[in-house]
Amino acid sequence: MTSEPRKSRGPFTPALFIASIMTAVNIQLLLLAGMCYLYGTASHQASRYSNLEILAISLDDGDIGTALTLASSQFDGRYHLPTVKIGSSQDYPDLDSIRNSVCKADYWAAVVINSGSSDRIYGIWNGSMSTVEYDPAAAATYIYNQARHPNIADSILLPGINALVKATTESFYGSSNARSALMNLNTSNVLLPAIKTYLNPIGTTADLIQPTPQLNRSFYNTYEIGLLFHGITGCPCLSMSVYIYAYRESWNVDGAVFCKSWMLYWLLMDIHWQVMETLIACYIPMQFSPFFVFPWIITNVASTVFPYEIMPAWYKIGYALPSSGVYTLNIHIWSGCGSQLGVALPALFVWWALGHITSVFAVRKRCSDSAKEPWSSSDST
């Protein structure tokens, strides 16, 4: 008994050619739309730097504290710099209270004129204090959480802080006490130290919340968020946590942080899996799955790449996405600081709960649809 020869494929028909072209065009449009959405997060970003607020506090009752207040009025949203808000020493009596305010994300950063700064400068000028006793960096302290969007913190907040300190110095030069003190110098043993102090009266000391100096920090809210789609078990999450921990360099995180991040990444992978399980091959045909998966990845990455304060208002829908909640929780795990937990935790719980509930119905629907499909003649013989 001879088998029937297999039929060769038909010619490349015009219909097949048109279908191939349409698929290629649709894929290109999908990529274009996705990347436009991602690039839109940085559109005219500099015009929104003023939405980042820096708290300015003077614990000094002298001229430097007054100069800070005068200089802060220049930072009102102009010049593509963060906005400076003047705080009261009654509300923030010490560095701990100011640091706590930044930790809670009430402000992105803080600049503090330390107590006694003016007296120390005038002590140099009148000869009652030696230059050995004076450190310009002790005049002011700046605070920000470097674990919270570190690239933005270093590229936007730090230049804003430096600009504020420079403006404070210029304002201090113009004070009547500073001018008269310098003009009244009359002894050579005081003149040289006084000039040195006059040229550099106000320096800064950094008091960073969770210093994050490693350069691979740029991947934490970009590449890593997109990579969390590549697995659904604890092993990929573990490997991700391992290489982040292994390349932490001088980053001060311990084993507890490592384990918490591992569990958090696992939660996010589980949410992504439940979303795919519910929709793909159930409500979205398999051939159209790229038109859902790619936008889902892009919108999740876009929700973490920049702070919402400097993105167009439309992107605030990212608060509802799971990746945004995971990055918010990661900041809290890494630094112990950050607000918006009241948004991140409920959002993640809703995604997780709904995903597990709807995936059950999705499986039932697929089984029901499969039972309704007739067997082909080739399979039934």
Model-found features: residue ranges?
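Hydrophobic alpha-helical membrane segments, chiefly transmembrane helices and signal peptide h-regions
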Residues: L31, M35, H230-S239
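Structural signal for the C-terminal ends of transmembrane alpha-helices
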Residues: T204, C237-V242
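Membrane-spanning alpha-helical segments of multipass transporters and channels
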Residues: Q214-G231, M240-T381
